[in-house]
């Protein structure tokens, strides 16, 4: 019979005092909680430490590098990775605990469906759901890869699918959502250009429309009511800004 596996929760933070407590409490079932903080100026570190988390301060190198640092600092081979604006639901916790009891036998990782809270209600359609991510994995067989923005995980071996939700409480307001997506668009354009990617006018004109149509119509985002419409419009603006900035950069102009 397989023995119970150890499990470390890995979280990265910067000025998340209003959300870190709920996040840390949601992973209280783990053997340890690691918080890697990039010099928050609020009470993030103190609040996390008060709940028993092991807090490590580190300069900000980018999303992928910071998340991988947290994984490397884990004391267990199995890790559960989440952001400060995410929480493990009760259903997901129960699933993970059942898997731990069996030592996660036969798997290198598990994907979880992330569900986003948008103005007080979870989005259940469109491009926002189900946002499947590999967040539970054996760090000996996987880790964080990709660019420093829109990073992801990759594991070598069998990946299972969990049903319990990872709850995402990301956007404090419409302005916060808009500003954050504009920031991500600029960073993504810079990353794509540095990687040698190029962009024609067609992507600037048509990719935003396709992103909106796919999410709002094909993936039934309209069933989320006005929230689904607003989310799809902000997404479309993100795609437009990303390709517009890449298009400008490709022509040797400052973006």
Go through the PLM ranges and name each one.
Residues 6-8, 32:
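Cell-envelope/extracellular polymer assembly enzymes that use nucleotide-activated donors
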Residues 11-29:
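Short, well-formed alpha-helical segments that are part of the catalytic scaffolds
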Residues 18-21, 42-51, 91-92:
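Acidic helix N-cap motif at the loop->helix transition within catalytic regions
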Residues 26, 37-47, 83:
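A conserved acidic beta->alpha catalytic loop
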Residues 29, 50-52, 75, 132, ...:
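Short, structured coil segments at secondary-structure junctions
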Residues 38, 58, 76, 83-86, ...:
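Short acidic donor-binding/metal-coordinating loop in glycosyltransferase active sites
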Residues 59-74:
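Glycine-rich, basic loop-to-helix element that forms the pyrophosphate-binding segment
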Residues 68-71, 78, 89-255:
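Catalytic-site signature of metal-activated, phosphate-bearing donor transferases
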């Amino acid at each position: 019979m397989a023995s119970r596996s150890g499990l470390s929760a890995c979280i990265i933070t910067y000025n998340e005092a209003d959300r870190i407590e709920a996040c840390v409490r949601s992973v209280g079932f783990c053997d340890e909680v690691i918080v890697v903080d990039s010099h928050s100026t609020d009470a993030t570190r103190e609040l996390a430490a008060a709940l028993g988390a092991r807090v490590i301060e580190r300069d900000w190198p980018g999303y992928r590098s910071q998340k991988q640092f947290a994984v490397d600092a884990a004391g267990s081979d199995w890790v559960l990775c989440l952001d400060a604006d995410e929480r493990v639901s009760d259903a997901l916790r129960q699933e993970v605990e059942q898997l731990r009891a069996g030592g996660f036998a036969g798997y290198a990782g598990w994907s979880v469906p992330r569900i986003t809270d948008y103005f007080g209600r979870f989005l259940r359609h469109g491009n926002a759901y189900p946002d499947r991510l590999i967040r539970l994995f054996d760090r000996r067989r996987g880790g964080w890869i990709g660019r420093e923005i829109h990073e992801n995980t990759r594991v070598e071996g069998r990946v299972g699918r969990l049903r319990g939700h990872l709850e995402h409480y990301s956007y404090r307001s419409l302005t916060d959502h808009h500003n954050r997506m504009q920031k991500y668009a600029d960073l993504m354009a810079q990353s794509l250009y540095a990687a040698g990617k190029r962009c024609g006018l067609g992507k600037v004109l048509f990719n935003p429309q396709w992103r909106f149509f796919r999410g709002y119509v094909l993936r039934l985002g309209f069933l989320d009511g006005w929230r689904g419409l607003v989310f799809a419009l902000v997404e479309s603006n993100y795609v437009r800004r990303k390709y517009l900035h890449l298009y400008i950069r490709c022509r040797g102009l400052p973006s």
